[in-house]
Amino acid sequence: MLPLSQLSRRERHYRYVQEARVKLLLTSAGVKNTSIKNALVDLLGKPIADSSALCIPTAMYGHPRVGPGAGAWQFISGQSENPMCELGWKSLGVLELTALPSIDEERWIPLVRDTDVLLASGGDALYLCHWMRESGLVDLLPSLSETVWVGLSAGSMVMTPRIGEDFVGWKPPSGDDSTLGIVNFSICPHLAQEGMPGNSMAEAEQWAAGIAGPAYAIDDETAIRVVDGTVDVISEGQWKRFPS
């Protein structure tokens, strides 16, 4: 088997989809309740207070209503309404993907490998996907078997095969809505009651009809956990699975 360095980008894509072993906690709005927090601790195998974290705000820069600006600072500093960085980590740093191509790999790869959890903010999933590829972070996924990826909205959607046209904002060079495909289902976050901010069930059903694959709609009290290909839903709220 050829090493990743000798493969084309397309070949590397299929390799890391097949080999990715990072543990996933895919949320709509962060660690919003006790059930999701308990699932996180279970994935870590130790208390949050004994765990190191790196937050990834990159997705925010691609979304016109989120960043750059105050939103990124609120996320990093733990002042947002979506609990991620303020959970009481042993250590917390920032991993800015747009900066990584301009610095030596030795400056950041060992740091990522030694970190317990990666916290990916919401924002634009296609922008985040682009920079996960450009930075080389996605190529590390097969070696991060002990690492937990906690996604928030776009930070969760980036792990899916595609996000659907309804969620396309920033457009990648490919022009399509495909994302990393680490999992085999798509996600519609922010499921909400009719008339409330977010995506209604009717809107989620219409979105799912255009996905042409398995999908989940999850509200802000729900997360999807994926470990070694096994998927389960942790929820104190509302969610729905759409078969392919």
Regions picked out by a protein language model, each given a short descriptive name:
Residues 60-127, 131:
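Portal/gating segments that form or line small-molecule/metal binding sites
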Residues 9-21:
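Short, Lys/Arg-enriched N-terminal segments with co-localized hydrophobic residues
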Residues 2-7:
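Extreme N-terminal basic, low-complexity initiation segments
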Residues 21, 48-53, 115, 146:
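A general structural motif
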Residues 120-196:
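Class I SAM-dependent methyltransferase SAM-binding "motif I" and its flanking Rossmann-like core
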